[in-house]
Design a protein with these regions (language model features):
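Surface-exposed alpha-helical interface segments used for non-catalytic interactions
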Residues: 19, 103-106
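Short alpha-helical oligomerization interface
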Residues: 87-104
């Protein structure tokens, strides 16, 4: 069984990749998200599979590098899909959007550098 990490897995693309891999491939999947855009901290697609033994969902803020310590370091695939998005958000707090998105990318790259992960998809 292959292992995948989906950073930003609570969003539209991430949750659909999760669904596809669970339904069509033999993968164990860790989904990481802060779920700031979901209703009540839940994403319908992820809720459908919450009890799957092949799915682990973590609510983490990856702008803090130490939170990466909770992850494995040997995923076959890493999907980096996390970002603060939305025109309203960008217009309201542009500096915060840049800070958060920069830290997400920087911390992910630092963690990948110290890991033995296979392929990375951005």
């Amino acid at each position: 069984m292959k292992k995948a990490l989906i950073i930003g897995g609570g969003g539209f693309i991430g949750s659909n990749i999760t669904q596809f891999l669970l339904e069509n491939r033999d993968y164990s999947i860790d989904v990481i998200d802060n779920f700031s855009r979901s209703v009540g901290g839940k994403t319908p697609i992820l809720e459908k599979y919450r009890d799957s033994e092949r799915l682990k969902i973590l609510n983490l803020d990856l702008t803090k590098l130490e939170n990466f310590d909770q992850l494995n370091r040997d995923y076959d695939y890493v999907f980096m899909l996390a970002a603060m998005v939305g025109v309203d958000k960008v217009n309201a707090v542009p500096h915060e959007v840049i800070r958060v998105n920069s830290m997400l990318l920087l911390n992910t790259l630092e963690w990948l550098k110290a890991s033995s992960c296979g392929r990375v998809v951005f």
